[in-house]
Every structure is written in C-alpha cells, then in structure tokens.
A protein has these predicted regions:
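N-terminal binding-site loop/beta-alpha segment at the start of enzyme catalytic domains
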Residues: 1-87
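Beta/alpha (TIM)-barrel catalytic core signal, keyed to glycine-rich beta->alpha loops juxtaposed to Asp/Glu
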Residues: 4, 136-300
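N-terminal small/glycine-rich loop or linker at the start of catalytic domains
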Residues: 13-30, 90-103, 127, 132
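Short, well-ordered coil/turn segments that N-cap beta-strands
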Residues: 15-20, 49-51, 82-87, 125-129, ...
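A short acidic, helix-capping loop that chelates divalent metal ions and anchors anionic groups
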Residues: 29, 59-63, 96-102, 218-222, ...
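Short, acidic/polar
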Residues: 33-46, 107-123, 169-172
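CE4/NodB-like, metal-dependent polysaccharide N-deacetylase domain
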Residues: 47, 111-132, 152-155, 177
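Structural motif corresponding to the early beta-alpha repeats
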Residues: 59, 80-107
Length: 300
C-alpha cells in the first residue's frame, strides 16, 4: 500500500495527533453501516493521515454488544498496513445503552475502572492511550467519578485522562482531582451548537485539548445540511473549491491550537473530505466572515 498522507498535528498531553480526528460513533449506533463498510471507512481515515480516533464502550446498538465500536476499531487497526503505533485511540466509560434506544449514566468509580479494563482488552492494548469519563452521573459526586481516572493512571491501565460533556466548574474540579493531569475535554461544539464556548476558552487557558464532538452538527442531517443552514460556509467553500464541511472544520481549527475536531463518519468519502480541512488555509477575512455570521467577536 502507499504511505498514508501526513496531516498537520496538534497535541493531546504528550502526544502529537492529526489536527482532525475520526469519531467512531456513527459506525455502531442507529443507522450504522455494515462491518465491511465501517472497516473501509476507518482504513480510509488512516490512509488520509488521521492519527486520532475517538470511541466509547457505549457506542453500540443492542444491550449485548457493549464495546461494538471499540472492537471495530481494533479490527481495522489490526488489518491496516500502516504504523498502528502512530494512532492514538481514545475511549470512554460512564455511559450505558440498555438496548431500548436510551442512554443512561453510571459514574460509580468501580464501574469506570472495570469498564476501562474491559475496553483495554477489546482494543488489544496493555494501556489505553486516552481514557475519558463520558458524562457526569447526577447520582455520583463528580470528584468520585474522576477519582477513578486517577487510579487508572496510577495503575497503568490508561496513559492519559480526559473528560467529556463537562462544565467549566467540572473542568476545574477534574484538573484538581487529577493533580494537573487532565489532558482533554470533549464537548459538543458546531456552528449550530456553541454553548460550549466557555469550556473551549477555559481549555485554552489551562493548556488542555478541546475536542468538539459533532463538529459539523451531527449525523441526523446537521452535518449534511450545514452549508444550507449557514450559507457563508457554502459561499467560502465555493470560492475555494471545497465543501462547506471543510470550511466549518477549518474555522473551528482557527479558534485555537488546542482545538481538535472529531467528525464522525459512516462512509470513507466523508472522513476523506473532513481530513482535507487540516490543510485548508482560509484568509483572515474569510475566518472573520464565518465568525461574524455566527455573532462571534474575534480578538484582534
């Protein structure tokens, strides 16, 4: 096979990863493609230069297939001809899918620790590169849930710790509980969902990677229609001969060197297009037009 494309990199903890990651969720939940197409999609992302893949044990459809997405990713990496050691796989625990279409939480430390060890087995690794507490559990004190990550770090089960779906106060609390070892925050962020801007800014101040999930607006049509809903991205895309999705991702990358979007994909062509955003060089005027259209004031 030919060598993978090399993309610009950004940093999570002490690891350099591609500026655009791959979100694995769409390949394992409602509307998921078959196994062959999923493997081909992951291979396409790797060949396009993506070296950061995000998954979770809760990315599955039926109650008896916990870790479906982790298993897919492990299989794809094992059958890929490139350097698997160059790829950082991030997973999560603390979310559950009972199998009836709902999502629930289990933030108990004992669950998080057991789930992480099970994830490591499914991924076929001695230590998980990045493990994230998936979502706060209202029935468990946040510090107790994050405390499980401390134990996992100290035991060598995970190499780095992150959190997801967190508020600014929870970010600060996690950083304190982890003794400064928090490396990433993964929150929803896109042109249509910008309520995580305080978290994005706080991560910049703290030197923590910010990982936007659903950076194009989600798999329910938001990603596909982003150029229709936000015409400036389509206009700039036409001017540059690229998709509006690439413009959105390039704009998000411009918000800070700590921002690493993780668009999901069900098809190879989707992630191939998204990966190109890492090299898309928009002018200062074009970036300002994007921000102005969303009512965001940029600092000079």
């Amino acid at each position: 096979m030919t060598s993978p494309t090399t993309l610009p990199t950004r940093t999570i903890g002490d690891r350099a990863v591609s500026a655009i990651g791959l979100g694995g969720m769409p390949m394992s939940i409602e509307g998921r493609p078959d196994r062959e197409r999923s493997i081909a999609t992951i291979h396409a992302s790797l060949d396009a230069g993506v070296t950061f893949i995000d998954t979770a044990d809760a990315y599955h459809l039926h109650a008896d297939e916990v870790g479906h997405n982790e298993t897919l990713i492990a299989e794809a990496l094992a059958s890929w001809g490139g350097d698997r050691d160059s790829v950082l796989v991030a997973t999560k625990s603390g979310h559950l899918r009972p199998g009836d279409g709902s999502w629930t939480q289990d933030g108990r430390p004992e669950h998080i620790k057991a789930a992480a060890k099970a994830s490591a087995q499914r991924l076929g690794v001695e230590a998980i590169g990045l493990h994230q507490f998936h979502r706060p559990d209202p029935s468990v004190p946040y510090a107790e849930s994050v405390g499980a990550l401390v134990e996992l770090l100290d035991e060598g089960v995970i190499q780095m710790a992150g959190i997801s779906n967190a508020t600014p106060d929870q970010i600060r609390e996690a950083q304190d509980v982890l003794g400064g070892r928090l490396v990433s925050v993964q929150n929803q962020y896109s042109p249509s969902f910008r309520s995580s801007e305080p978290e994005l800014q706080l991560c910049d101040e703290l030197g923590i990677a910010f990982l936007p999930w659903s950076p194009l607006g989600g798999t329910g049509g938001g990603a596909r229609d982003v150029g229709t809903r936000f015409s400036v991205f389509a206009e700039i895309g036409r001017d540059n001969g690229v998709s509006p999705q690439q413009v959105v991702l390039a704009w998000e990358l411009s918000l800070g060197e700590h921002v690493i979007p993780i668009p999901g994909a069900r098809r190879a062509t989707s992630i191939q297009d998204s990966a190109l955003a890492a090299d898309l060089d928009l002018s200062a005027d074009e970036l300002r037009r994007c921000s102005d259209s969303l009512g965001i004031e940029l600092e000079d």
